[in-house]
């Protein structure tokens, strides 16, 4: 099955606590990575967690470790793709289209916004 959300897409968090209560619901961000085996996506600026790493030394002799804030993956069902034309979250459908390349006809799936009906 073709992926409904891909790397580089703009998505919006649709579940969880509201932003005014410290959550991420309603926030938008760009997809940095898609984990297909666990059905999770890494979204820029969303689901930020504090990670404590042990202090050590790198090969150059500099100190490593400390407290850093990184993004954690979020389940793909908790985000919705943002329609580029309306800037609102939408469901994604597919449309089959035949493309002729070098004399060979090939059927490709094109992602379509369910709300506006336009190609994504």
From Swiss-Prot:
Which keywords has UniProt assigned to this entry? Answer: Ribonucleoprotein, Ribosomal protein, RNA-binding, rRNA-binding
Output the Gene Ontology cellular-component terms: ribonucleoprotein complex; ribosome
What domain of life does the UniProt record list for this protein's source? Answer: Bacteria
Pfam families cross-referenced by the UniProt entry: ribosomal_L24
GO process terms (BP): translation
Q: Which GO terms describe its molecular function?
A: rRNA binding; structural constituent of ribosome
Q: Give the matching InterPro entries.
A: Rib_uL2_dom2 (IPR014722), Ribosomal_uL24 (IPR003256), Ribosomal_uL24_KOW (IPR041988), Translation_prot_SH3-like_sf (IPR008991)
UniProt lists the family membership as follows: Belongs to the universal ribosomal protein uL24 family.
The subunit structure is: Part of the 50S ribosomal subunit.
Function (record text): One of two assembly initiator proteins, it binds directly to the 5'-end of the 23S rRNA, where it nucleates assembly of the 50S subunit.
Q: What is the protein name for this chain?
A: Large ribosomal subunit protein uL24
Gene that encodes the chain: rplX
């Amino acid at each position: 099955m073709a992926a409904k959300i891909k790397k580089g897409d703009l998505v919006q968090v649709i579940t969880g606590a509201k932003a005014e209560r410290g959550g991420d619901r309603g926030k938008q961000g760009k997809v940095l990575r898609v984990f297909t085996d666990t059905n999770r996506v890494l979204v820029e600026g969303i689901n930020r967690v504090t990670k404590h790493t042990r202090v050590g030394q790198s090969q150059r002799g500099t100190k490593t470790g400390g407290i850093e804030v990184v993004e954690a993956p979020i389940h793909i069902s908790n985000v919705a793709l943002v329609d580029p034309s309306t800037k609102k979250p939408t469901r994604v459908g597919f449309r089959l289209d035949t493309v002729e390349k070098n004399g060979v006809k090939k059927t490709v799936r094109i992602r379509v916004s369910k709300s506006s009906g336009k190609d994504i």
